[in-house]
Amino acid sequence: MAFNSQPIEGWHGKLDLVYADRSNSTQLIYNHQQAPLKVQRPFYPEGEKVCHSVILHTAGGVVGGDRLSYNLHLQPNAQALITTAAAGKIYRSEGLQARQTIDIKIDAGACLEWLPQETILFNGAIYRQDLRVELATGANFLGWEITRFGRSARGEKFYQGEWRSHTEIWRQGVPLWIDRQWLPGNEAVFHSPHGLAGQPIVGSLVWLGSAVSTEIIAKARNLGNTQGEKGVTSLENGFLCRYRGASTSEVRNWFTDVWQLLRVEFFSRSKCTPRVWQT
């Protein structure tokens, strides 16, 4: 089944954010936004060093033909945590592809914690997401992605549509991690062990920029009381966690435990769960 990958109508939301370190306080110094994307006023629940930001999609959901473009830049030594106000919803399409593109640049000594809430693909959604991160020497990135295929609470399964996810993380022209995922919506793929194995949720967490010890890898594997499948893979400059299962809270709890582990190890910071996750 062929899909139209060139949207000809719909929203084109844009969000450009620049963070800078000012006397050991991270400030959002540039903010350009175009509906339906918007960022709330920055706040500092753990002190001035780390700037917390919450992104909103004011239209409530994404339809075929929509385009969302993000450009995020952390200047040297800036520290930011960015999440979203709610789960993303990708609605059923009549043939047009919805697309999200995120470009992130992290300068020396800076760290971004990119922690969006889950994305829910309705049956029949046609969606592509691209994430590219450019790391300077001494920069760090922690990001996760949690995707639910079908509104499983209603018994819906992802039997129609298409999902593509392309992720690239680079440092000075050298690829640190390249990930390509494609899932066509059909019953065979949904139940195949090479697809979703009948499970509606997949998740990935990646930490890149600083090498981790074998002890950290072992701890990450042992964290979380999960019924779903999970795995941890060591990378040259970090590591990768994968999940496939049936519970959003299960995967997020595991990812949050891993995130906390890294915060303590590399920044001597305690967990600071975004309040918006509890609303």
UniProtKB/Swiss-Prot annotation:
Chief location bin: cytoplasm
Q: Where in the cell is it found?
A: Cytoplasm
Tell me a GO cellular component.
cytoplasm
Any single Pfam family the record assigns to this protein = UreD
Q: Which residues form the signal peptide?
A: none
Free-text function comment from the UniProt entry: Required for maturation of urease via the functional incorporation of the urease nickel metallocenter.
Q: Which family does it belong to?
A: Belongs to the UreD family.
Instruction: Relate the assembly described in the record.
Output: UreD, UreF and UreG form a complex that acts as a GTP-hydrolysis-dependent molecular chaperone, activating the urease apoprotein by helping to assemble the nickel containing metallocenter of UreC. The UreE protein probably delivers the nickel.
Name assigned to this protein: Urease accessory protein UreD
Organism listed in the record: Trichormus variabilis (strain ATCC 29413 / PCC 7937) (Anabaena variabilis)
Q: Which gene encodes it?
A: ureD
